[in-house]
């Protein structure tokens, strides 16, 4: 049976973690580290702030049960996602966010390991002005 979570942000189902977690490949004190609650699964979410309006995210987790996420909607930004393990391993995605409500399903006992790069609007505006 799937558990359903209603969230305002995708990452709010994680608990606060430490940058000194030995499972992390590399971490700095400025990184934001979140860990999967033991009741839901095992793993982490690492948020690395590269520069203003550019963030690198590393996710590596496995769930005990299926989870359904209902989200109010992410703020406007774009994401490049690279799947390293899990159901979509080897694939990459471009995901634009427009602030619209979303629904996502994550399956139990599958490893989700991916890298995400997020670009926020101010840097996007500069880029699109240069391109046009």
Model region roles, listed by residue range:
Residues 1-36:
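Short Lys/Arg-enriched alpha/beta "domain-start" segment
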Residues 34-132:
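N-terminal regulatory/effector-sensing and dimerization cores
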């Amino acid at each position: 049976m799937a558990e359903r979570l209603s969230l305002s942000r995708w990452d709010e189902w994680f608990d606060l973690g430490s940058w000194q977690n030995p499972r992390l490949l590399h971490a700095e004190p400025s990184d934001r580290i979140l860990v999967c609650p033991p009741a839901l699964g095992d793993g982490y979410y690492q948020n690395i702030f590269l520069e203003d309006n550019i963030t690198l995210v590393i996710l590596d987790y496995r769930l005990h049960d299926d989870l359904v996420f209902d989200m109010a909607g992410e703020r406007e930004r774009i994401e490049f996602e690279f799947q390293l393990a899990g159901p979509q391993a080897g694939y990459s995605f471009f995901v634009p966010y427009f602030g619209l409500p979303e629904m996502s399903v994550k399956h139990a006992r599958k490893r989700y390991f991916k890298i995400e790069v997020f670009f926020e609007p101010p840097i996007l505006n500069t880029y699109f002005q240069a391109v046009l």
